[in-house]
Every structure is written in structure tokens, then in C-alpha cells.
């Protein structure tokens, strides 16, 4: 379900302050996976927490409007079972 248009996009206030005061090339660490990517974020690198570590995410124009958490997967896919013991 989409967010109501009258509410507008969500971004954590502390994150927005960090972005405005950040220097070029600096990785901005954040736990706010739910924050929407704004046009002001383009060209910045965020360290998005996935529950274990910070995943570096470089923001491009195509990412505007999405959430930060979409680009830092929280689950590791181990793959499906092997056929090692199977005889033909």
C-alpha cells in the first residue's frame, strides 16, 4: 500500500541533517532503511545497516523515490540443494 500523497515522502530528520553537513566522498552511516531517497542525496554514499554490517550504497538519479533499505539486502541466499549424492 502506497503512502498518502498528503503526508509526503518520509525521511529521518537526523539523516537529512547528516546529508546537508556531509563532505564529498564521506560515507554517511545510517540505520534508517525506511527513509525515502531525495534528489539532494544524488552523488552521496550511504552506509545502510542490514542487521549485521553497513552496506555501501552510492545514490544515482534512478534511485530517487525508492527507500534506502531496498539496496541493502538483509538475507543471504545460501542456494538450493546440491545433487552430490544423487545417482543417475
Curated annotation (Swiss-Prot):
Top-rank lineage group of the source organism: Bacteria
GO CC terms in record: cytoplasm; small ribosomal subunit
Family: Belongs to the universal ribosomal protein uS19 family.
Keywords of this entry: Ribonucleoprotein, Ribosomal protein, RNA-binding, rRNA-binding
Known role: Protein S19 forms a complex with S13 that binds strongly to the 16S ribosomal RNA.
InterPro entries referenced in this protein's UniProt entry, alphabetically: Ribosomal_uS19, Ribosomal_uS19_bac-type, Ribosomal_uS19_CS, Ribosomal_uS19_SF
Pfam families: Ribosomal_S19
Gene: rpsS
GO MF annotation list: rRNA binding; structural constituent of ribosome
Organism per entry: Mycoplasma capricolum subsp. capricolum (strain California kid / ATCC 27343 / NCTC 10154)
HAMAP family named in the record: Ribosomal_uS19
Name of the protein this chain belongs to: Small ribosomal subunit protein uS19
PROSITE patterns reported in the protein's UniProt record: RIBOSOMAL_S19 (PS00323)
Example GO BP: ribosomal small subunit assembly
Amino acid at each position: 500500500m502506497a503512502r498518502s500523497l498528503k503526508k509526503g515522502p518520509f525521511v529521518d530528520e537526523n539523516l537529512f541533517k547528516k546529508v546537508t553537513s556531509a563532505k564529498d566522498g564521506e560515507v554517511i552511516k545510517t540505520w534508517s532503511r525506511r527513509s525515502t531517497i531525495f534528489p539532494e542525496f544524488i552523488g552521496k554514499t550511504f552506509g545502510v545497516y542490514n542487521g549485521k554490517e553497513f552496506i555501501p550504497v552510492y545514490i544515482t538519479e534512478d534511485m530517487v523515490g525508492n527507500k534506502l533499505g531496498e539496496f541493502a539486502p538483509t538475507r543471504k541466499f545460501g542456494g538450493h540443494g546440491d545433487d552430490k549424492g544423487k545417482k543417475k
